[in-house]
């Protein structure tokens, strides 16, 4: 739970009572509106974990052709989900949806999360009391090498931990988590070879670390979110929770 501290002058009765009440009003955090959360949508939780069976609306025959059809369906679904939270043009939905669910999870964990102040032309996605967060989200059916940009984040943001005096956490979401684990080997898995682990340890020693978004989900104990998690099949259950 976030703790708020009033300025010393409040306790010393050096300001009028009505002003104290106004200060208290703005210092009390708003309760989390769980009903409006994207994490309440079962398909969002399934998408986050890589269970895309809800998109399979036709018989799969040809891998290349099927992937193109699924890409269209994934984009239509993503835009629809984002509009539930942010009505309007949701054509470029991937990054926005990732940031929304990341913010939701941290609020559910009782963390204070906000947009950080821009420093030296750096504008990370979020800041908590303990960390700076950079959110990387991808679709599952995007072709090409766009995801390889994630590999360069530690170098690009190498100065961020010193600038903000906080460790940098690179949160991988959706297709980004899948590729980082199964293709690039920067998340735990078979592709994380000893030499890659050496580089990752170097990043961590310099306060930069990659995190898998699904590691946060299992630790949530809100009924609405658990209902979505319980819809996952046995072979798509989430891994043990990751504790910040």
Which positions does each model-derived feature cover?
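Acidic-basic catalytic patches of nuclease active cores, encompassing PD-(D/E)XK
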Residues: 2-115
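Residue-level marker for well-ordered alpha-helical positions
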Residues: 100, 104, 154, 193-197
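Core catalytic machinery and nucleic-acid-binding channels of phosphodiester-processing enzymes
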Residues: 117, 125
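Beta-rich catalytic cores
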Residues: 122
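Catalytic cores of nucleic-acid endonucleases
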Residues: 137-191
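Domain-level recognition of nuclease-like catalytic cores that cleave nucleotide substrates
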Residues: 169-244
């Amino acid at each position: 739970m976030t703790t708020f501290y009033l300025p010393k002058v409040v306790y010393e009765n050096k300001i009028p009572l009505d002003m104290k009440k106004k200060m208290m009003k703005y210092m009390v955090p708003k309760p989390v509106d769980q009903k409006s959360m994207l994490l309440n949508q079962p398909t969002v939780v399934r998408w986050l974990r890589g269970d895309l069976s809800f998109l399979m609306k036709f018989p799969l025959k040809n891998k290349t052709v099927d992937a193109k059809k699924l890409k269209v369906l994934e984009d239509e679904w993503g835009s629809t989900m984002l509009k539930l939270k942010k009505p309007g043009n949701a054509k470029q939905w991937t990054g926005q949806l990732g940031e929304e669910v990341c913010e939701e999870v941290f609020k559910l964990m009782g963390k204070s999360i906000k947009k950080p102040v821009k420093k030296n032309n750096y504008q990370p996605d979020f800041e908590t009391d303990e960390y700076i967060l950079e959110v990387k989200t991808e679709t599952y059916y995007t072709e090409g090498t766009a995801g390889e940009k994630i590999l360069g984040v530690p170098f690009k943001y190498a100065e961020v931990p010193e600038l903000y005096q906080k460790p940098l956490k690179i949160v991988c979401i959706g297709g980004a988590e899948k590729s980082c684990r199964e293709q690039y080997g920067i998340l735990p898995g078979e592709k994380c070879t000893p030499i890659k682990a050496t580089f990752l340890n170097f990043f961590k020693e310099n306060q930069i670390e990659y995190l898998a978004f699904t590691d946060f989900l299992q630790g949530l104990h809100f009924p609405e979110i658990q209902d979505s998690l319980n819809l996952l099949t046995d072979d798509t259950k989430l891994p043990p929770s990751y504790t910040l």
